[in-house]
A protein has these predicted regions:
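Acyl-group handling in specialized metabolite and lipid biosynthesis
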Residues: 203-216
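Internal alpha/beta domain cores that form substrate/cofactor-binding pockets in large enzymes
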Residues: 31-37, 60-79, 84, 92-108
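An anion-binding loop in the catalytic cleft
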Residues: 215-300
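Short beta->alpha connector loops
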Residues: 12-16, 65-69, 89-92, 229, ...
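A residue-level signal for conserved active-site and pocket-lining positions in enzyme catalytic cores
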Residues: 11, 33, 54, 84, ...
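N-terminal Rossmann-like dinucleotide-binding module
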Residues: 1-44
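Donor/substrate-binding cores of folate-linked one-carbon enzymes
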Residues: 4-5, 25-26, 83-201
């Protein structure tokens, strides 16, 4: 690969923004930015309008709805892009786009690849107590299966929330790119193939997957609430037929009672018993305020 490659970036979230910021700091030759159109913002948790930031940096930028659109392919060829960074984008990159840059595409994933390939990695990481990471890798036709260029593991706290993990990822992206970008600038890459025999996969998550099952253990309910918290839609339950969305909670192992029942109310916060232990609800959203009382039942 030649030194001082021409770079383009496609993305839609904080990790995309962070990558663009670092590319600029390292004086990489960023010739274009492809920003997911604001019309798609509601479909993306933590959406970031990259076009606005790119224009602040005086980098040409265009919106896209489909990253595989022919107009994008033509623009990559017209600008002689050597490397396309695809960061923070859930759309599948098709073979035609993979082949468009002279030296391919670089992707990002917040797990220790080959473990944790797939979707909703941050939520699954908290839900299943996985090891998060910053991994930059060469995109190929598989799902997060290309050779690894840079990888740094991240410590997961016992009470981690998505927003705190995202902050850790953002700071670790800086460290990883401080290692990777000087190599790319010199025209050097040292890709390491993944061990596909050790691969694990994460499935797509939908809003309804945040429905709380109070017959689960308090630990499991606590993880579900944390995994679905901001910037995601939140875990939820129903009381008196009304939906409540829950964004934070605290374990209260000293309480035992019937699953899904309010066993205490402390400073306005209900303590709900589960199959094992209980949790105290913190941040709650509902159409109407709930007048919590001991003995109230939530839907199981």
């Amino acid at each position: 690969m030649k030194a001082h490659p021409k770079i383009a970036l496609a993305g839609s979230v904080n990790s995309s923004y962070q990558t663009l910021k670092k590319l600029h700091e390292h004086n990489m030759d960023v010739v274009h930015v492809f920003a997911l159109h604001p019309e798609k913002a509601k479909q993306v948790s933590g959406y970031k309008d990259l076009k606005i930031f790119a224009e602040e940096l005086r980098i040409p930028a265009t919106y896209f709805r489909d990253i595989n659109n022919n107009d994008i392919l033509q623009l990559i060829e017209k600008k002689h892009v050597d490397i396309l960074f695809v960061v923070g984008l859930s759309q599948i990159v098709k073979a035609s786009l993979l082949a468009a840059p002279n030296h391919g595409c670089i992707g990002f994933h917040p797990t220790m690849l080959p473990k944790g390939r797939g979707r909703a990695a941050i939520a699954w990481t908290i839900l299943k107590n996985l090891t998060p990471a910053v991994t930059f890798f060469q995109l190929d036709r598989g799902a997060d299966s290309g050779p690894i260029l840079e990888q740094i593991p991240i410590d997961l706290d016992r009470n981690e929330y998505p927003l705190t993990l995202i902050e850790k990822i953002k700071s670790t992206i800086n460290v990883a790119l401080d290692e990777l970008l000087p190599k790319l600038k010199e025209g050097k890459m040292n890709p390491k193939p993944q061990d596909h025999s050790k691969a694990t996969y994460l499935g797509v998550r939908r809003e309804e997957d945040g429905c709380i099952q109070w017959k689960a253990s308090a630990e499991d309910v606590h993880r579900l609430i944390r995994a679905n918290s901001h910037p995601y839609p939140g875990a939820y339950s129903f009381v008196n037929g009304e939906k409540i969305t829950i964004y934070s909670a605290t374990l209260r192992p000293e309480f035992t009672g019937v699953s899904g029942r309010v066993i205490a109310v402390e400073q306005g916060n209900p303590v709900i018993t589960c199959a094992e232990g209980a949790i105290e609800l913190g941040e709650i959203q509902s159409v109407q305020p709930v007048n919590w009382k001991i003995g109230m039942d939530l839907e199981l």
